[in-house]
UniProtKB/Swiss-Prot annotation:
Listed name of the protein: Probable phosphatase YcdX
Group of enzyme by EC: hydrolase
PANTHER family assigned to the protein according to its UniProt record, in alphabetical order: PHOSPHATASE YCDX-RELATED (PTHR36928:SF1)
Keyword field contains Lyase: no
Ligand binding (Zn(2+) 2): H15, H40, H194
Length: 245
């Protein structure tokens, strides 16, 4: 098990069922040292209000030895790469994930999807692209991976894509991993937990990475320090409370 999980949802996204406290308890039990809460951006129908994200600044940084990153899974809104995270939201958040979700951006042809994803990557506003292997949104894996390397953005391998959602993702996720490997980029693993019980579960992701001989040194979840170095390279100020994670 890796000690970092970068994608999960709380009861603030009303189709999820666990609280921040639930995730902290599970993290302690499972040996997770650092995790990010990434509830859906406000353009989703059941997502939190934007004030929810702004007020995440009141969260403690560390509880019982577990570090907590303040994040969002924003929605890609259009081909210009706009997302539903802006203004004061950025000031309160550590981690910006963004991806396609049908209620906000309907599936298009491969060229349009690729244009939208690359524009999002190039915007400088996101750290990770969520579930880029979704078969509902065909993309040019090579072009997206090369753009991600250029702009220091990681592509996610999402464990839930093989279990509960986005059926048929396996071949695409293998292609994503291979393209990132060839481009020399980063992958981020996300459990995409909607209950705390599945946080830190990456078994299906690891099968994909093993299948393409993906280099472990390019996986962000290997250690808290690796992930924090990545975020700091993107401009995040060092967080003193995380120094001993």
């Amino acid at each position: 098990m890796y000690p970092v999980d970068l994608h999960m949802h709380t009861v603030a996204s009303t189709h999820a069922y666990s609280t921040l406290s639930d995730y902290i308890a599970q993290a302690k039990q499972k040996g997770i040292k650092l995790f990010a809460i990434t509830d859906h951006g406000p353009d989703m129908e059941d997502a939190p209000h934007h004030w929810h994200f702004i007020n995440m600044r009141i969260w403690p940084r560390v509880v019982d030895g577990v570090g907590i990153l303040r994040g969002i899974e924003a929605n890609i809104k259009n081909v210009d790469g706009e997302i539903d995270c802006s203004g004061k939201m950025f000031d309160s958040l550590d981690l910006i994930i963004a991806g396609f979700h049908e209620p906000v951006f309907a599936p298009h042809d491969k060229a349009t999807n690729t244009k939208a994803m690359i524009a999002t990557i190039a915007s400088g506003n996101v750290h990770i692209i969520s579930h880029p292997g979704n078969p509902r949104y065909p993309i040019d894996f090579k072009a997206v991976s090369e753009a991600a390397v250029k702009h220091q953005v990681a592509l996610e391998i999402n464990n839930s894509s093989f279990l509960h959602s986005r059926k048929g993702s396996e071949d695409n996720c293998r292609a994503v991993a291979a393209a990132v490997r060839d481009a020399g980029g980063w992958v981020a693993l996300g459990s995409d937990s909607h209950t705390a019980f599945t946080m830190g579960e990456f078994e299906e992701c690891l099968k994909i990475l093993d299948a393409v001989d993906f280099p472990p040194e390019r996986i962000l979840n290997v250690s808290p320090r690796r992930l924090l170095n990545f975020l700091e390279s993107r401009g995040m100020a060092p967080i003193a409370e995380f120094a001993d994670l």
